[in-house]
Every structure is written in structure tokens, then in C-alpha cells.
Amino acid sequence: MKRLLIAATALSIMGLPLLANASPKQDLEQFRAYFFKKFPGVKLQDFGNGIYAIDPVRRDEWQNIEEFPPYEAGIDKGKALFNKYGLAKCFKNGGKGIKQNYPYFDSKSGKVHTLIADIQACIVKNGHKPLGLKKGKIAGIAAYMAYTSRGKVQNVVIPNDKRALKIYNRGKTHFYAKRGQLNFSCADCHMYSSGQMARGNLLSPGLGQTSHFPVWRRKWAKKTAAKKGKVGAFGGFGTIERRYGGCNKQVRAKVLNKGKKWKTAQHPEYVALEYFHTSMSNGIKLNGPAVRQ
């Protein structure tokens, strides 16, 4: 960890952070260029496979797991819940094959909509109690919707609207800003130190990260099994909301979505981060849900 701290500090100084006044198009071009240079030979679409695009040994192991994926039961149960809550009538195309367009900016409300938030809104609209947003049922529903969108190309639109750009830039600032006792940013781990080890885990490239959410993590599955005695259909699942909070916790920063208020609602800071973060994977095909470390 000490070596990683030193490397991250040096690389964040030497690296090429995205310009504050750059357009979303310029941001995407620079973001891709950084990773193409850092990992020569890795094609754009392969970045959607996370660490398995940069580590051949881990890739072989992952491919073996994907032959009998542990998330299949979760997809099936997520589909059943999708139907139970009547979600098809709230989404275009009945909620199938639409994840590639999320998050999106709504010009009428001036807000960014995430898939998780729209699922929650529909559940409440249909007279049901809201769900927790980090894991469990909502992660299973999102996993099913992601599965129906596999192969679709990520296409987050950042319109030339001051309100949309303000949210986008808020997320961009969060991605590059250092925080917590470890003084790490998202970019420190997933740009400058990507491909290095930290606490036994290989740090994944930021490019393509959002293409496979919600994810089924072995770490989360083990935690569920230890607590409940079994993993269950949703035990290994987590939304990107869960991952953001976990990352903040790991760098000993304030977890913004912690507490009763944020159990069933998304923190605007994480919405902004998801808007920027996902747009940096535009052009990459969705492949979620997926197994991760």
C-alpha cells in the first residue's frame, strides 16, 4: 500500500488529468488515449472486461467461471421481480435493451436519471415500498435489465445544456479530486495506478468500468455467506451505488450514501459521478452483469 501511495502521488503529478474546461467529447478522447497508451494492444471493447483485459491468468480463471456464472439465479429472480412490480410499463421498449442510454439528462426536470433511480420511482409509483439501492432486490432487477441490454453500445448523451454540464462537471471533479485520510482520488486508483496491486486486488482501468454493472463480486458473496450462512440469488450482487460508497470507505473518506436518508434515495454527488464515469465508457458494449473480484 505504501508503494501504491507513492506511485499514485507521482503519477497524478506526471499524468494527464482532463482539462477543467474541456468538452465531454474532448474528455472522452483524452480518457481513451490515456488507457490506450498505458495498455498498448488492449482493444477498446476489451476494456469492458475490466482486469481480465490486462491479466491473462485472471482472464482464464474468469472465463471458466463465466461458463457456469454464479449470477444466473439472480437474473432469473430479478426478472420475476421486474414482472411483479410491473416495471415494463414505466420504461421504453418494456424495459428491455435500454440500459445503454443510462444515465440520461431530462431537460424538463433539469435532473440526471439513473437506471436504479428510475426503477425505484416506478416501484413507488406502482404502490410498492421503496427498495434499498445498493444490493438485494433492486440489484437483481437491474441485473436482469442489464442482461437484456448485453451487446448494446454505451451511449450516454451530455447535451449542450448548462444544467447537464454542471452535473457532468461535478462528477468529473469528484473523479479527479483527492479525498479521505489516504488522500486518493478515483483517478489515482483507476487511472494512474490501474494494473497495480492493492490489498491483494488488481486495480481495474477506469475505461469500461461501468459496462458490466451491476456486478457479482466474490468479496460480497463471501460477506453474505458469512453473515447469513448462504449466498442466495442476490448475495453477490451490488449496484454501482454500492461500489462508490465502498471506494470512499476504502480511502477512509466520508461515505456519502450512508445512513437512513440514503438507503432508498441516491446521493446527488454519486449521481453526478455516475453520469461522468459512465460517459467515459461510451462506445463500449455492455456485458453486465459480470463476475468481479
Predicted features and spans:
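Sec/Tat signal peptide C-region and signal peptidase I cleavage site
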Residues: 16-22
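Solvent-exposed, charged amphipathic helical/linker segments at domain boundaries
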Residues: 152-170
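Bacterial N-terminal signal peptides that target proteins for export
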Residues: 1-7
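Electron-transfer interface patches adjacent to heme c in soluble/periplasmic c-type cytochromes
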Residues: 23-73, 83-140, 147-151, 157, ...
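Bacterial N-terminal signal peptides
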Residues: 8-15
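An amphipathic alpha-helix/helix-turn recognition signal
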Residues: 73-74, 166
